[in-house]
């Protein structure tokens, strides 16, 4: 069931709105109680003997969290800092009591056992060899990562509301297009907790900042600073890099596709993805949207091909990894994945981001540069 559509339908009448409001207040109470239990020792938080940096958000879906984790992991790994990602692996098949590890020869673990987002990240980071350890118990996953890989930094993927594993820094993403989830907690809005949770943040990334005007961005920053007066707020954008022609396994430039196209996705914020394609010059004549993390079937792919006709089809990397194994028997040509990366606006601002990941990062780079000059 598409929860977003269900919520919108319920909001169309007074009884539906009241029902969502009651559920939202119940959810809010649950978040308050959970936080209270951890803060007062009724539930235990655990530390590990290395730096832990959380990359998360206060709203559900669509902020660009996965691309931020990829940027953080690549930034650290390319600087020679041993890094691992800790993830829950949302909606994966939980067949293993032990953590699932994605690394090098263990990449044959498929997305069903690992989760679509961790599996996609493992593919994207294969060249810099960043392991990803997946388990619902993030402390158990962190312990496994430290034991196996001697990680200097653990990136806690989407763990801002997860208190079982202590962390050294919280990087929180806020979407400039819809920053505070309508001001209501789930399921009435998309907030995962009240805005007071921003007091725990050490750094905020205002994502999709190029899709909001300056006045709106300043208003968002003012609201953030009402909760956390001295926090650094950086602006980030999602930048298209290229298309990947999956049928021929080649990268093609962004100007390769123009005119009519079909698009399908099962992601948190499909509207942003579709707007990006329009900005790149595509006219979207067929659009398929599915709930986040949905598995694709052979029938889905056949439908896309039949209805798209001679027009190209475009999707995301996250969707691509969820194709059925025999997808090549169905998709013969004109199917593309849009590659997108996150960029921090400004060199000084990027250095602030890097220092939040690893406090000695700038000094480390200075030493590397001085050595290279010799």
From Swiss-Prot:
InterPro entries per record: LpxK, P-loop_NTPase
Residues given in the record as ATP binding sites: 59-66
Pathway(s) where this gene product acts: Glycolipid biosynthesis; lipid IV(A) biosynthesis; lipid IV(A) from (3R)-3-hydroxytetradecanoyl-[acyl-carrier-protein] and UDP-N-acetyl-alpha-D-glucosamine: step 6/6
Cellular component aspect of the GO annotation: plasma membrane
UniProt KW Lipid biosynthesis keyword: yes
SUPFAM superfamilies reported in the protein's UniProt record: P-loop containing nucleoside triphosphate hydrolases (SSF52540)
Endpoints of the signal sequence: none
One biological process term in Gene Ontology: lipid A biosynthetic process
Keywords: ATP-binding, Kinase, Lipid A biosynthesis, Lipid biosynthesis, Lipid metabolism, Nucleotide-binding, Transferase
Catalytic activity line of the entry: a lipid A disaccharide + ATP = a lipid IVA + ADP + H(+)
Domain of life per record: Bacteria
EC number per UniProt: 2.7.1.130
Disulphide linkage map: none
GO molecular function term, any single one: tetraacyldisaccharide 4'-kinase activity
Family statement: Belongs to the LpxK family.
Known function: Transfers the gamma-phosphate of ATP to the 4'-position of a tetraacyldisaccharide 1-phosphate intermediate (termed DS-1-P) to form tetraacyldisaccharide 1,4'-bis-phosphate (lipid IVA).
NCBIfam families assigned: lpxK (TIGR00682)
HAMAP family: LpxK
Protein name: Tetraacyldisaccharide 4'-kinase
Top-level taxonomy: Bacteria, Pseudomonadati, Elusimicrobiota, Elusimicrobia, Elusimicrobiales
């Amino acid at each position: 069931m598409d929860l977003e559509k269900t919520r919108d339908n319920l909001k169309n009448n007074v009884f539906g709105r009241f029902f969502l409001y009651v559920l939202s207040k119940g959810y809010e109470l649950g978040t308050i109680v959970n936080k209270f239990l951890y803060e007062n020792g009724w539930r235990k938080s655990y530390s590990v003997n290395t730096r832990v940096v959380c990359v998360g958000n206060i709203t559900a879906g669509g902020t660009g969290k996965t691309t931020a984790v990829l940027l953080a992991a690549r930034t650290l790994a390319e600087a020679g800092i041993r890094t691992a990602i800790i993830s829950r692996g949302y909606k994966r098949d939980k067949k293993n009591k032990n953590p699932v590890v994605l690394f090098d020869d263990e990449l044959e673990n498929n997305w069903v056992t690992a989760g679509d987002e961790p599996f996609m990240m493992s593919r994207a980071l294969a060249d810099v060899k960043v392991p990803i350890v997946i388990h619902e118990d993030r402390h158990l996953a962190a312990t496994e990562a430290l034991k196996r890989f001697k990680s200097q930094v653990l990136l806690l993927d989407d763990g801002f509301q997860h208190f079982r594993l202590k962390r050294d820094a919280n990087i929180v993403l806020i979407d400039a297009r819809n920053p505070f989830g309508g001001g209501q907690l789930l399921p009435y809005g998309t907030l995962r907790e009240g805005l007071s949770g921003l007091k725990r943040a050490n750094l905020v990334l205002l994502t999709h900042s190029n899709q909001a005007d300056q006045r709106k961005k300043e208003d968002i920053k003012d609201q953030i600073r009402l909760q956390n007066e001295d926090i650094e707020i950086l602006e980030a954008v999602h930048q298209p890099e290229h298309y990947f022609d999956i049928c021929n396994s080649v990268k093609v430039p962004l100007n390769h596709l123009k005119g009519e196209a079909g698009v399908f996705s099962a992601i948190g914020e499909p509207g942003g993805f579709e707007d990006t394609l329009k900005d790149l010059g595509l006219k979207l004549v067929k659009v398929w949207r599915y709930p986040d993390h949905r598995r694709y079937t052979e029938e889905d792919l056949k439908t896309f091909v039949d209805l798209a006709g001679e027009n190209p089809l475009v999707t995301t990397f996250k969707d691509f990894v969820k194709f059925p194994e025999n997808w090549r028997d169905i998709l013969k040509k004109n199917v593309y994945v849009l590659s997108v990366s996150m960029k921090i606006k400004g060199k000084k601002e990027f250095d602030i981001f890097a220092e939040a990941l690893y406090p000695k990062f700038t000094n480390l780079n200075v030493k590397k540069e001085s050595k290279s000059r010799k």
